[in-house]
Regions:
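Catalytic beta-strand/loop cores that center a nucleophilic Ser/Cys/Thr
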Residues: 49-129
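Extracellular ligand-binding/catalytic regions of CAZymes and related secreted enzymes
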Residues: 105-111, 119-187
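Glycine-rich, charge-decorated loop segments at or immediately adjacent to ligand/cofactor-binding or catalytic sites
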Residues: 35-46
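Beta-propeller domains with acidic blade repeats across secreted/periplasmic ectodomains
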Residues: 11, 168-478
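Structural recognition of the beta-strand scaffold that forms the well-ordered cores
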Residues: 1-3, 26-31, 95-98, 125-129, ...
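Short alpha-beta junction capping motif
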Residues: 1-37, 122
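Short, solvent-exposed loop/turn segments at secondary-structure junctions
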Residues: 7, 34-36, 101-104, 121-122, ...
Length: 478
């Protein structure tokens, strides 16, 4: 699909697109796509016409081929849109489905072709001129037009596989509950979605093309995982927190624990579960170091170690203390073992205020590092709000994310370099803080339609990723 204003296309790109469609691919150019790629005249012929001019008005595009499968379930709808006028029409293999009746200012008095389909070799093309802005895109009848058009364009076999897949999923069930927040001030709060089994939930998860999901461990063996790490033996260590975020207990004795999940028979699923340590209250991260585990357990950082080989921690010591617990949503997190043998982490607006090896530190909303034995600490990069993500590229540069409106920042020069000079804050590098989830029923609290729960910043550096991904893409949870 294309929905964009791009003036040029390379010859190689055009050859690939043309070949894709002629060999059976589906192509869905929408609205301004009919203006694109003026340097390739053949592109207009593939689309079926080219945008020439427009005004703007409230109008209803009229259906003229109601029986066509690309209009299955589609109703006419009225909305403000740009009143496209096309030229360079290619009527070969084209069927016009909807038209816009002539209106004042049009260069002609005939109905203007508005939505059409055409065939190109073995492939199919669906085009609609609708879609200038949210006045159209927010319309449920436009959603149906796009859905029906896409399902026609992909072809009958792909559509049949899609419908078979939908039929295999357990239907989602909802119920109204009084305690569901309505921060967005919708006319009605979103209903509560009843839970699915992990297996059924995976069917509702969309993975990138070429990727697949595999279930390694799930409830009831692990509960409320808040962080995990893989060890050198391929075992998954999971930090479980049933107390997070509201059950902050006096003395910090709680119900949370670290659990080792192991696949003992090589079938790709965990079948052995061992509690390494328990009795914690809202731990938020862990990292392997010094033959054991360092656990973020505000206000303290703990070192845990198994000394007798039974996979249970029998040594527990406090490395340092000082992290705030005023808001459990804003404490330390995302511990990572750095290339320089320091431990890196993030903290939000529940800041660190304490001493490490006799030196006073006071910082918040940024990244820090410390030595694995707790003998030294440094605050590295200041950012502007609740910091919950850190990651390294292959060169060891530090990147991160914040909960609100800043899904990706570059650490740059650390504060330790500046000494007494004015320091430079980390800089946002994301092109936009906007958040585009696949499902529509997303509850947000602060930055509506943008990142309001951003966390993590893991670069795709493994050789298991496509070459085009490596060191060029990062995963940030929303």
């Amino acid at each position: 699909s294309i929905y964009a204003n791009h003036p040029r296309l390379t010859a190689k790109q055009w050859k690939n697109l043309q070949s894709y469609v002629r060999n059976g691919g589906g192509f869905v150019p929408v609205h301004c796509a009919s203006w694109c790629f003026s340097n390739i005249p053949e592109f207009d012929q593939l689309v079926g016409g080219r945008f020439k001019s427009h005004q703007g008005a409230d109008f209803t595009a009229r259906v003229v081929k109601k029986e066509h499968p690309a209009l299955s379930g589609v109703k006419e709808f009225k909305a403000w849109d740009e009143t496209y006028f096309h030229h360079r029409h290619n009527e070969k293999g084209r069927t016009v489905l909807m038209v816009r009746d002539a209106m004042p200012g049009d260069p002609h008095t005939k109905p203007e072709p508005w939505t059409w389909v055409r065939t190109e070799g073995k492939g199919r093309v669906f085009y609609t001129a609708s879609g200038h802005d949210q006045r159209v895109w927010n319309h449920t009848d436009f959603h149906q037009l796009m859905k029906s058009g896409i399902l026609w364009a992909v072809g009958d076999k792909a559509k049949a596989r899609y419908e078979k897949f939908l039929a295999s999923r357990v239907p989602l069930k909802y119920e109204k509950r009084d305690n569901v927040p309505n921060y967005e001030r919708r006319p009605e709060p979103l209903p509560y979605q009843l839970p699915l089994s992990p297996e059924e939930s995976m069917k509702y998860t969309q993975a990138p093309v070429g990727f697949r999901l595999e279930l390694f461990a799930s409830e009831p063996e692990i509960i409320n995982p808040i962080y995990f790490q893989w060890d050198e033996r391929g075992r998954l260590w999971v930090v479980e927190s049933v107390d997070y975020p509201n059950e902050l207990k006096p003395g910090r004795k709680g119900n949370d624990r670290i659990k080792i999940c192991e696949d003992t028979n090589g079938d790709g699923k965990a079948d052995k579960f061992t509690v390494f340590a328990d009795g914690f209250n809202i731990p938020t991260s862990m990292v392997f170091a010094r033959g054991g585990v360092i656990l973020a357990h505000a206000p303290e950082f703990l070192f845990l170690k198994d000394t007798d080989g039974d996979d249970k921690a029998d040594q527990r010591e406090v490395l340092f203390t000082g992290f705030g617990v005023g808001d459990t949503h804003a404490g330390p997190s995302n511990l990572r073992y750095g290339f320089d043998n320091w431990i890196y982490g993030t903290v939000g607006y529940s800041p660190f205020n304490g001493e490490v090896n006799g030196e006073k530190h006071n910082f918040g909303s940024g990244t820090f590092r410390f030595r694995p034995d707790g003998s030294d600490m440094e605050f590295l990069h200041q950012f502007n709000n609740n910091t919950w993500g850190i990651g390294f590229n292959e060169a060891g540069d530090v990147f991160g994310s914040t909960a609100n409106n800043n899904p990706s920042f570059f650490g740059g020069i650390p504060n330790t370099v500046f000494g007494s000079q004015r320091r430079m804050s980390a800089k946002m590098i994301a092109s936009s803080p906007k958040f585009h989830p696949i499902p529509p029923n997303i509850r947000q609290v602060d930055a509506f339609n943008a990142y309001t729960a951003g966390c993590g910043h893991a670069f795709a550096t493994s050789s298991g990723f496509p070459k085009s991904w490596r060191d060029r893409r990062a995963f940030v949870c929303g």
